Structure formats: C-alpha cells, structure tokens
Design a protein with these regions (language model features):
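Binding-site signature for planar aromatic cofactors or substrates
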Residues: 1-199
Length: 199
C-alpha cells in the first residue's frame, strides 16, 4: 500500500515539512544533516551542516557556522545555494534551492547563541579559522577546550565568530522511490506553483 502522499501534492508538502521540523530536535533524523552546496566562479563546494531551524510559515531553514569559514566568503559573493536531504528509510529525497542571509552579532544570532549548549560553543573559540593549514593533526583547539575546561562565561568569547545562515527557500524538488513507480514533484515557493515531474 502506497502512502497518502504518493499521488497528492498537498500531502507531500505536509510530509516533508514534518520531516524537516522533526530533524531540528531529533538527532537520529537523516534530515538533520543535509549537504549544503554553494558555488564561487567555476567551483562548486559541498559540506554537511546541522539543521537548526525549520520555519514553514516563512519558508526558511537555518544552520550555524563560523564567520571565518570559507563558505561565508563564498556566500558573500554569491548567496544562491542548495541543500540536499535524503532519508533512506522513508525513501525520500529533497533538493532545496535557497537564497542565503549571513547573520553575525545581531538579534538573530543573539537568540540562537543563547540556545547553544556549552559543549557546542567551543567550536567558535579556536584561534585559527576553519580550513587553516596545520603541520600536525589538530582539532584547532587548545587542550582546555578539548577537555571542556571552560565556563559558560568564558565561552562568550566565541560569540563574535558565531554565525547563523538563514536559507530562504525558493523551490523544493521532492523524489519518492517506490517499486510500483517513483514519484517526483516540484514546489515553487516563490510563485506557489506546484507540478508533477517525470522521475
């Protein structure tokens, strides 16, 4: 028996938003760690990010990064990007095209920083930016950080590097794999026009 969303566009939207919402708090969700892809000139770069917010009302997705990360420089030059989600058990793939907004030391980051746990804040306390060349294997952290030997007050030093990337969704392509026959659809969130596609 096929799921309700097999041939119903509205049910498809309800399904993928439910999966995105769940991924924000469910560490076991495959949708929690999508591939984020952005491009600069003739190079396309991809990496795993952690989904931190899903907002259906405003068509937004959100993740955190370090202001010194190379992807921030790329997004400053070209804010268009894509997120790729896949859930093996659900057999659902999402290709999400977005426009990105970089937030640093503003109300958006203040709100997210307050929710960021002690264990996660150390990522923003490294002396060297992400991607810096090193002669030896390294976490980039001094031993005190690796051992979590710092207070919440000391962790505030990392706030200047803490950055929130807001991804305004332009379109979503949904693919469902089924033995009976795959299903594929595109949802244009800018024009509110949806269409079935040949898988």
């Amino acid at each position: 028996m096929q799921p309700a969303y097999y041939e119903n566009l509205e049910e498809i939207q309800n399904k993928y938003w439910s999966m995105l919402d769940d991924a924000v708090t469910n560490r076991a969700s495959p949708f929690r760690i999508p591939v984020f892809m952005c491009a600069h000139q003739d190079e396309i770069d991809g990496r795993i990010v952690v989904l931190r917010k899903s907002d259906r009302e405003n068509n937004l997705l959100q993740f955190h990064t370090d202001l010194r990360s190379p992807k921030v420089d790329i997004l400053k030059k070209n804010n268009k990007a894509s997120l790729l989600f896949y859930d093996k058990e659900e057999k659902i793939q999402l290709r999400v095209k977005v426009d990105c907004e970089i937030n640093n030391q503003n109300p958006t980051t203040e709100k997210s920083w307050k929710k960021t746990q002690h264990i996660s804040r150390r990522c923003y306390l490294t002396d060297s930016p992400p991607g810096t060349t090193s002669e030896n294997p390294t976490s980039g952290m001094i031993s005190k950080l690796e051992d979590f030997d710092y207070t919440m007050e000391q962790s505030e030093e990392g706030y200047k590097n803490f950055t929130v990337i807001k991804c305004k969704i332009k379109s979503i392509e949904w693919l469902y794999l089924a033995a009976k026959g795959h299903r594929r659809a595109k949802f244009d969130l800018e024009t509110n026009k949806n269409a079935w596609l040949v898988p």
